[in-house]
Curated annotation (Swiss-Prot):
Gene3D superfamilies: 3.30.230.10, GHMP kinase, C-terminal domain. It is an enzyme of class 2 (transferase). The lineage of its organism: Bacteria, Pseudomonadati, Pseudomonadota, Gammaproteobacteria, Vibrionales. The gene is ispE. This is 4-diphosphocytidyl-2-C-methyl-D-erythritol kinase. ATP binds at P101, M102, G103, G104, G105, I106, G107, G108, G109, S110, S111. PANTHER family: 4-DIPHOSPHOCYTIDYL-2-C-METHYL-D-ERYTHRITOL KINASE, CHLOROPLASTIC. Belongs to the GHMP kinase family. IspE subfamily.
């Protein structure tokens, strides 16, 4: 068996959250998909994956997520999709250290899938490009390519047109109201705004940021409305994605932490800084540098 420096080595990889700093719905395509303009930014807070590549050919994950069969786990789906795409016979054991809420609108599952693709592409030495990994990722979820590419991005169309963006790296207080929101229900709602005019990124960055889904989510989910109303007393605040997470923006960590301290202990919340280069990209570069392989 050939020598493979990364096999049986335990490695740690971040799986960061994202925020939609704005989200506009511009119309619908002929096949019913919504056309969007949205700005993705990563934050320096998220899950962590400990990954050990091996020769088994199998992908194992711990801990098991209650109520989610292995075949439905996005980490497993990402790893096996990569195996199939690259005709790869290596395996891996992946341990998920879960911090981000499921279904919160901050990209937890999509980020896990992207971290799996990026890490195993490196550990299995497949040398696939970001374009190839993003193509695999798109079949797993619409937001996966953003996490794979690892740069803040302005997304258009049905979310597939990505261009790099460089918004200010502010501090955020992210709060998760204790409700689960089905994205499909929001996009199907008859009162959803679907005719916001398209604008270029520079115009959008200089205009007040809005999430077109927010009005409907606040109407349907009183917990979200209550939390947003509370945050808006202190700072510009809005919904990310279709929720349920909401966020307030601040110019300093201390300001954000002061407001966090006023929240009830029963409320799930965290403070994080926006990052235009994903912590995942930075970790990959560190591993590549340490092994003297070109980036």
């Amino acid at each position: 068996m050939e020598h493979h420096p990364m096999i049986e080595t335990s490695t740690r990889w971040p799986s960061p959250a994202k925020l939609n700093l704005f989200l506009y719905i511009n119309g619908r395509t002929e096949n019913g998909y919504h056309e969007l303009q949205t700005l993705f930014q990563f934050v320096d807070h998220g899950d962590e994956l400990t990954i050990q590549a091996n020769h088994s050919g199998d992908v194992t994950i711990s801990p098991e997520i209650e109520g989610v069969p292995l075949q439905d786990n996005l980490i497993w789906k990402a790893a096996t999709a990569l195996q199939n795409y690259a005709h790869c016979s290596f395996g891996a054991h992946i341990e998920l250290h879960k911090v981000l809420p499921m279904g919160g609108g901050i990209g937890g599952g999509s980020s896990n899938a992207a971290t799996t693709l990026v890490a195993l592409n490196y550990l299995w030495q497949l040398n696939l490009t970001d374009d190839e990994l993003a193509e695999i990722g798109l079949k797993l979820g619409a937001d996966v390519p953003v996490f794979v590419r690892g740069f803040s991005a302005f997304a258009e169309g049905v979310g597939e047109k990505l261009s790099p963006a460089n918004p200010e790296e502010k501090w955020y207080l992210v709060v998760r109201p204790n409700v689960s929101i089905a994205t499909a229900d929001i996009f199907r709602h008859p009162d959803l705004t679907r005719n916001t005019p398209k604008r270029d990124l520079e115009t959008l960055l200089n205009a007040p940021s809005v999430n077109d889904c927010e009005k409907i989510v606040r109407m349907l989910y009183p917990e979200v409305d209550k939390q947003l109303s509370w945050l808006l007393q202190y700072a510009p605040s809005r919904l990310t994605g279709t929720g349920s997470c909401v966020f307030a923006e601040f110019s300093s960590k201390s300001e954000a932490e002061t407001i966090l301290a006023q929240l009830s202990d029963k409320v799930s919340a965290f403070v994080a800084q926006g990052r235009n280069i994903s912590p995942l990209k930075e970790t990959l570069a560190e591993y590549q540098s340490a092994s003297h392989r070109p980036i």
